[in-house]
């Protein structure tokens, strides 16, 4: 993947000509009726950001949700890009806390799959995971 992602984010990789790899995770979320989605981008995110600007494809509600895109904030105190998924979540905890959602789904934007996140959530609740 290194060669493929030198000039674009992995989530923006074309799949079958008209899709991007992130489309599968976003479609899964939309089909699972998730209304508020945060995307944490890191580097080479221009083409991914351009693609995400057309978020009408996934119909994330604007009144009670929406599609939120976060890039790393590099400051004098923090000169790092995200150092993995856990760090991206940690640096954006304020978004998660202010969302007032009882549950959060964390999914990768570089995998191609179809999943009903409601079934996953039901299982986790049932097992008290």
List where the protein language model places each region.
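A phosphate-binding catalytic loop at a beta-strand-loop-alpha-helix junction
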Residues: 1-4
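Conserved N-terminal catalytic core of the sugar/cofactor nucleotidyltransferase
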Residues: 6-10, 14-123
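A short, conserved acidic/glycine-rich loop-to-beta-strand motif
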Residues: 127-129
């Amino acid at each position: 993947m290194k060669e493929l992602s030198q000039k674009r984010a992995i989530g923006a990789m074309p799949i079958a000509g008209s899709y991007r790899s992130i489309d599968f995770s976003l479609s899964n979320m939309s089909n699972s009726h998730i209304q508020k989605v945060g995307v944490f981008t890191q580097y080479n995110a221009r083409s991914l950001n351009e693609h995400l600007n057309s978020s009408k494809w996934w119909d994330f509600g604007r009144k009670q949700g929406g599609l939120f895109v976060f890039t790393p904030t590099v400051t004098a105190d923090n000169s790092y890009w995200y150092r993995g998924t856990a760090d991206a979540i940690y640096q954006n905890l304020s978004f998660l806390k202010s969302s007032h959602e009882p549950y959060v789904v964390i999914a990768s934007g570089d995998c191609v799959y179809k999943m009903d996140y409601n079934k996953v959530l039901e299982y986790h609740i049932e097992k008290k995971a």
